[in-house]
Regions:
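Flexible, compositionally biased loop and terminal segments
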Residues: 1-219
Length: 219
C-alpha cells in the first residue's frame, strides 16, 4: 500500500486524539508530524504529505474545543503555501486558552539545539552577554519550544523504541511509553493505557523514593 494512505489515516486519527485529549484535560499536546530528515524520502511522498497538511486541518476542530494551534521546527524549509497555512492557523487560534496543540514540522531536535547555540554565540560575540551567563535556562529560552513546558509523557507508537531526534533536550525527565500499535490505529483505549501507565509511575527527578514519599506525606 502507498505510504501516503498511511499519512492520510494518521492525520485523520490526529483529529480524534486531539478531541480526546481536550476532554481529558490535557493542556499541551505536541505531535511529531515531519522531521527534517523526512525530506530525504521520495519526492512524491513528501509532496503528497505537504498536500495533506494543506487540506487536512479543519478550523472547526480548534474553534469547537478552544484549542490554540502552534508549529515548531525549521518552518522556512517548508513550501511557502504550507508556511502560510500554518502561520494563518496560529493567528486564527491565538485567542484560545484551552489546550495548546503543537505540530512539529520540518523538525530536528539536534538542529534546534544547534540553532539555540548559534543565537547564544551571537549574543556573546555582540557583547549582549558573557559566557558565564550561559546556563540551562539560557538554552531553553532559545529553543523553538521556549514557550511550553517540558513534556511529562512521550508516547511512541508503531513498535519503535527510539525517539528519533525528537525533543532531546526537553525529554530529560519525561516518562516514555512505547506501544506496538501504529499511529493510525492508536485509539481511545490505547491513549487511556498510556495515561494509566504514566499515573502509576513515580517521578523522582534525581531524588530517592524515600524522599518523594516524605514530600507526598507533607502535602
Amino acid at each position: 500500500m502507498d505510504r501516503t494512505f498511511g499519512h492520510k489515516a494518521g492525520l485523520d486519527n490526529l483529529e480524534t486524539i486531539t478531541t480526546l485529549c481536550c476532554k481529558l484535560g490535557v493542556k499541551y499536546l505536541t505531535v511529531y508530524a515531519f522531521s527534517i530528515e523526512n525530506f530525504n524520502r521520495p519526492a512524491y511522498e513528501v509532496e503528497a504529505l505537504m498536500g495533506l497538511v494543506l487540506s487536512f486541518f479543519k478550523m472547526q476542530l480548534f474553534h469547537n474545543n478552544n484549542v490554540s494551534f502552534h508549529v515548531v521546527g525549521d518552518v522556512e524549509r517548508l513550501p511557502q503555501s504550507v508556511q502560510d497555512k500554518l502561520r494563518s492557523m496560529e493567528e486564527e487560534t491565538a485567542m484560545y486558552d484551552g489546550m495548546a496543540m503543537t505540530i512539529a514540522m520540518s523538525y530536528s531536535s539536534k538542529q534546534e539545539i544547534v540553532n539555540a547555540a548559534k543565537i547564544i554565540s551571537r549574543k556573546v560575540q555582540n557583547g549582549e552577554m558573557s559566557i558565564d551567563d550561559i546556563d540551562e535556562d539560557t538554552i531553553e529560552k532559545n529553543l523553538w519550544t521556549n514557550w511550553m513546558p517540558d513534556p511529562d509523557l512521550l508516547i511512541r507508537t508503531g513498535g519503535e523504541v527510539r525517539i528519533s531526534n525528537y525533543l532531546l533536550w526537553q525529554c530529560a525527565y519525561s516518562e516514555f511509553y512505547f506501544c506496538d500499535t501504529y499511529w493510525p490505529d492508536f485509539s481511545e483505549e490505547e491513549l487511556h493505557k498510556a495515561i494509566i501507565s504514566f499515573q502509576n509511575r513515580q517521578r523522582r527527578f534525581g531524588k530517592t523514593e524515600a524522599q518523594i514519599e516524605a514530600e507526598e506525606k507533607k502535602k
